[in-house]
């Protein structure tokens, strides 16, 4: 497992390692496996992120943002109150909160299944990523 990812010995069976890769977009007409994210998160039987399990294992809910150049950024998957659905998911790399977060657009509604698409707001731009793997931890 990559540096910065949690130890898995004590995690519930619902935890998964999820790999997202950049889908087709302007500038990347074929998508790109070099741009993406690896998430460690609990999934319910509906393949959505399980917010209740997140509460009791929040430190284990991690994200690694990878790019073709530069170091990987390691952070946390954060669930915050607010938004139109009452709560939303963020990817936070600076736990002190000095840097801006990346928002997982409608992550609470997304099914993390191979072939599905999810959107992440990076700075002021929305990017779409394809779920390419979901593995038990």
Predicted regions and their residues:
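N-terminal intrinsically disordered, low-complexity, charge/repeat-rich segments that act as generic
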Residues: 1-60
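Short amphipathic beta-strand and strand-loop transition segments with alternating hydrophobic
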Residues: 2-9, 76-81, 134
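A short, compositionally biased
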Residues: 14, 84-86, 112-116
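Short beta-strand micro-motifs in enzyme catalytic cores
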Residues: 16-18, 89, 127
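A structural detector for beta-sheet-dominated domains
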Residues: 21-23, 40-42, 67-69, 80, ...
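Glycine-rich loops and low-complexity Gly/Arg-rich segments
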Residues: 45-48, 63-68, 114-116
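Short beta-strand/loop turn elements enriched in aromatics
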Residues: 57-103
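Short, compact, well-ordered microdomains
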Residues: 92-137
């Amino acid at each position: 497992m990559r540096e910065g990812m949690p130890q898995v010995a004590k995690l519930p069976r619902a935890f998964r390692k999820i790999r997202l890769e950049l889908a087709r977009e302007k500038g990347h007409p074929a998508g790109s496996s070099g741009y993406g994210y690896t998430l460690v998160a609990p999934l319910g039987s509906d393949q959505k992120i399980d917010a209740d399990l997140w509460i009791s294992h929040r430190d284990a809910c991690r994200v690694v943002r990878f790019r073709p150049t530069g170091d990987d950024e390691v952070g946390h998957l954060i669930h915050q109150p607010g938004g139109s659905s009452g709560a939303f998911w963020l990817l936070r790399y600076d736990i002190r909160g000095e840097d801006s977060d990346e928002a997982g657009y409608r992550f609470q509604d997304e099914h993390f299944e191979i072939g599905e698409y999810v959107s992440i707001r990076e700075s002021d731009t929305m990017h779409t990523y394809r779920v390419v793997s979901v593995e038990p931890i």
